Curated annotation (Swiss-Prot):
Keyword Cytoplasm: yes
Name of the protein described by the UniProt record: Arginine deiminase
Gene: arcA
Residue positions of the active site: C406
GO CC entries: cytoplasm
Keyword Cytoplasm (UniProt): yes
Length: 418
C-alpha cells in the first residue's frame, strides 16, 4: 500500500479547480435578526431555506464540472468524531474568557453529550441561552437569561463561515490560517484549523503552514483570503485595505520567500471601504488573461512589489510600482496586457452590480465562471468576451456581501502555463 501523501495546493486563479471547501447556510443564519445582523457583518436577515436551496444549486453546478466539493458542516462533523480533535476545539472555545466562569463546565459537558452532527451545528451556529437545558448550571443560567435575555449567546453564531474564502487561503503548496479583522469572524479560523489538523482529508496530506496561529494574539496583523490570489508564475496578489494589514502581508511574503514558494508578492493598496472590503470584490480572474474589474476602485489601487533579497535584514525588498495595477499584474505573468471586462451598465448600474458582487466571480476552469444572476450587465459583457457564465441566485446568498469567489476556498487548483 502506498504511503505517499496527497499534495494540496492552489497554483493559479484561473486553472482547473479540483477541490474546494464551502459552507452551507444553516443554524448561524437562523440566528440573524434585525437587531444583531450588523454586529454579525450581514446587511440584512436572510430567508434561510431559500439560501440553502440556492447554495445547493451552487454546489451542484460545481460538482457537475467534476469538482470535489467539501462542505464545512460535514468536515467538522467528521473531525470531532476524533476525541483529540474535539478536546482541541473545546479547550479553545469554552473558556472563562469566552463563556464566563459560571457556565464553562456546564456548557462543555452539554456540548460533549451531543451527537457529532448536532455538535458541529452548534459550533458553527452558536449556542443561545435557551439552548442549554435548565438543569445545566440552573441558578447561573436563570440569572443569565433574566439579565441578558433568552436569545443572548453563550457562543456567538458564525454566519460568515458561508464565505470560506476568507478564513484560510491556499497559496501554492501551503495555507495561511488567517487572523481575521473583525472579532465576529475570528472563531471561524479556529474551526477551519481543527479540520486541517485532524480531518483525514488534510491530516494525511502534504502542505506547509505559511502564516497564522489561532492560539496566538496577532495584534494589528490581520489577513483575509478575499485579498489573496496566487495567480501563477510564482506571483501572489494581496490586497491591503480594510481587512488585510501591512503587518500580516510582510510576514506572509517573508515566509513564502524563505521556502522558495513565491518569487514576488504584489500588494494592492485599496481604499478602506465596505464596498471594496477585499481585492476580490473589485477584481477577479475569468480566464488566463482576462479579469473583471470595478474601474472606479481598481484605477485607484497603488501597487507595491515585494521580492526576495538575501542582503536585506528581512529577506526581501519593497518598491512602489510606477505602472498601474493592471499593467503590473500583466507584466508579472509575462503578458503584454490583460483583457479587461469592466462592471457593466451606466454609472448607477455599475455601482449597484459591484455592490452585488458582479466582479466577485469564481473561475472553475479557464473561461468558465460562476456569478450571481442579478448582475445582468456584467454577465453579458463577460459572455461577449467569450466567458461562459454559470449563474446562481443572489437574492438571499448575497445579503452577506459575497459572491462565488467569496463562497469558495479552493484547496487544489491546477497551474496555468504562462
Amino acid at each position: 500500500m502506498s504511503t505517499e501523501k496527497t499534495k494540496l495546493g492552489v497554483h493559479s486563479e484561473a486553472g482547473k479547480l479540483r477541490k474546494v471547501m464551502v459552507c452551507s447556510p444553516g443554524l448561524a443564519h437562523q440566528r440573524l435578526t434585525p437587531s444583531n445582523c450588523d454586529e454579525l457583518l450581514f446587511d440584512d436577515v436572510i430567508w434561510v431555506n431559500q439560501a440553502k436551496r440556492d447554495h445547493f444549486d451552487f454546489v451542484t453546478k460545481m460538482r457537475e464540472r467534476g469538482i470535489d466539493v467539501l462542505e464545512m458542516h460535514n468536515l467538522l462533523t467528521e473531525t470531532i468524531q476524533n476525541p483529540e480533535a474535539l478536546k482541541w476545539i473545546l479547550d479553545r472555545k469554552i473558556t472563562a474568557d469566552s463563556v464566563g466562569l459560571g457556565l464553562t463546565s456546564e456548557l462543555r459537558s452539554w456540548l460533549e453529550s451531543l451527537e457529532p452532527r448536532k455538535l458541529a451545528e452548534y459550533l458553527i451556529g452558536g449556542v443561545a441561552a435557551d439552548d442549554l437545558p435548565a438543569s445545566e448550571g440552573a441558578n447561573i443560567l436563570k440569572m443569565y437569561r433574566e439579565y441578558l435575555g433568552h436569545s443572548s449567546f453563550l457562543l456567538p453564531p458564525l454566519p460568515n463561515t458561508q464565505f470560506t474564502r476568507d478564513t484560510t487561503c491556499w497559496i501554492y503548496g501551503g495555507v495561511t490560517l488567517n487572523p481575521m479583522y473583525w472579532p465576529a469572524r475570528r472563531q471561524e479560523t479556529l474551526l477551519t484549523t481543527a479540520i486541517y489538523k485532524f480531518h483525514p482529508e488534510f491530516a494525511n496530506a502534504e502542505f506547509e503552514i505559511w502564516y497564522g496561529d489561532p492560539d496566538k494574539d496577532h495584534g494589528s496583523s490581520t489577513l483575509e483570503g478575499g485579498d489573496v490570489m496566487p495567480i501563477g508564475n510564482g506571483v501572489v496578489l494581496i490586497g491591503m485595505g480594510e481587512r488585510s494589514s501591512r503587518q500580516a502581508i510582510g510576514q506572509v511574503a517573508q515566509s513564502l520567500f524563505a521556502k522558495g514558494a513565491a518569487e514576488r508578492v504584489i500588494v494592492a493598496g485599496l481604499p478602506k471601504s465596505r464596498a471594496a472590503m477585499h481585492l476580490d470584490t473589485v477584481f477577479s480572474f475569468c480566464d488566463r488573461d482576462l479579469v473583471t474589474v470595478f474601474p472606479e476602485v481598481v484605477k485607484e489601487i497603488v501597487p507595491f512589489s515585494l521580492r526576495p533579497d538575501p542582503s536585506s535584514p528581512y529577506g526581501m525588498n519593497i518598491r512602489r510600482e510606477e505602472k498601474t495595477f493592471l499593467e503590473v499584474v500583466a507584466e508579472s505573468l509575462g503578458l503584454k496586457k490583460l483583457r479587461v471586462v469592466e462592471t457593466g451598465g451606466n454609472s448607477f448600474a455599475a455601482e449597484r452590480e459591484q455592490w452585488d458582487d458582479g466582479n466577485n466571480v469564481v473561475c472553475l476552469e479557464p473561461g468558465v465562471v460562476v456569478g450571481y444572476d442579478r448582475n445582468t450587465y456584467t454577465n453579458t459583457l463577460l459572455r461577449k468576451a467569450g466567458v461562459e457564465v454559470i449563474t446562481i441566485s443572489a437574492s438571499e446568498l448575497g445579503r452577506g456581501r459575497g459572491g462565488g469567489h467569496c463562497m469558495t476556498c479552493p484547496i487544489v487548483r491546477d497551474p496555468i502555463d504562462y
